[in-house]
């Protein structure tokens, strides 16, 4: 399988899967996403890590933190101020009748460019430079109801694999040894995530109970 990641820059939303395979090669892995498409993951060269979202044999999403894309004029290592001078980041996303306020702590911006949403990620420790981006068609993005996906084992495993890839791309950039998969570490991380989720749910419930109690006292 000959991989040519330099051709990734020419892949665009709407291209077909055959074009992708013929230009950059077969993926190292195919992951589930929180949307209806699957990520074709290219991680053989971590300095040129990229993912292509494929739905019904067509490209609906692109991600990279190592290669620019001709689909957008935002380039890696650009400054956040430069991006914001050119585009106005979205302040909220509307899902049905609900508006979800975007509060990114200046770590990313979501831009509306043509028929796509573009999420631009910034490295707040490196002069707020663009360190990655995700392009997704509005049609593909609309398949997610709300902001957060429904969890399942396959999606969890995909997120875990992608997290390891992203950590290793950063380690590669900083000339550090890459991390290998550890079942023990994965089990520990899952347990920690479950504990945190339970704590968050409890905090939300406690807040709701307090609000209800205050309202009940006022009525009395």
Residue spans of the language-model regions?
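Functional surface patches built around histidine and acidic residues
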Residues: 1-220
